[in-house]
Amino acid sequence: MKFFLDTANVEAIRAINELGVVDGVTTNPSIISREGRDFETVIKEICEIVDGPISAEVTGLTAEEMIAEARSIAKWHDNVVVKIPMTTEGLKATNVLSQEGIKTNVTLIFTVSQGLMAMKAGATYISPFIGRLEDIGADPYQLISDLRGIIDLYGFQAEIIAASIRTAAHVEAVAQLGAHIATIPDPLFAKMTEHPLTTNGLKTFMEDWASFKQ
């Protein structure tokens, strides 16, 4: 399984990348806006830090607008993946872009049919949202399982990016269900390395060693 960082905070990306567990980065307009910096500059900086797919999202609403934006964004770096919303216009754009060899990540997937349509249109990645489905009482894990089953059954080349990840339990569950990738907010990365028993165990080791050295 691959781990992507779901952030545009360059310093956080640089720090977490040193752990050797980051395979890519995802961003969206909300994440970019929180940084208060130029979109293109931020994406290019991220591409210099992480050697893997870096998702950058279009903001146009029509297929024509998305295609024009995507062509421009794709020129920023070879690792850039253009994020496209799961809409009818988004599917039109994905179809054109896939034929041009531009990698796409179709986002805001909440149903099997949406995922299937995105894959048929040529999406490189599809992003079902875990936390947001839980918010409305739906089962995100069944969605991941169903999408992975369809990929395996029909041989689609798309990879599943489990998004809207909020807890370590989310990561563990989607890993067990076969999601290819989990995209994880930077604060959660730190929490995934921690456990009270680990902390207490290390403390005990150090205390015992200090007593022995005396």
Curated annotation (Swiss-Prot):
InterPro entries: Aldolase_TIM, TAL/FSA, Transaldolase_3B, Transaldolase_3B/F6P_aldolase, Transaldolase_AS, TSA/FSA_arc/bac. Keywords: Cytoplasm, Pentose shunt, Schiff base, Transferase. The keyword Cytoplasm applies. PROSITE patterns: TRANSALDOLASE_1 (PS01054), TRANSALDOLASE_2 (PS00958). PANTHER family: TRANSALDOLASE. It catalyses: D-sedoheptulose 7-phosphate + D-glyceraldehyde 3-phosphate = D-erythrose 4-phosphate + beta-D-fructose 6-phosphate. The active site is at 83 (schiff-base intermediate with substrate). NCBIfam families: fsa_talC_mipB. This is Probable transaldolase. The gene is tal. Its EC number is 2.2.1.2.
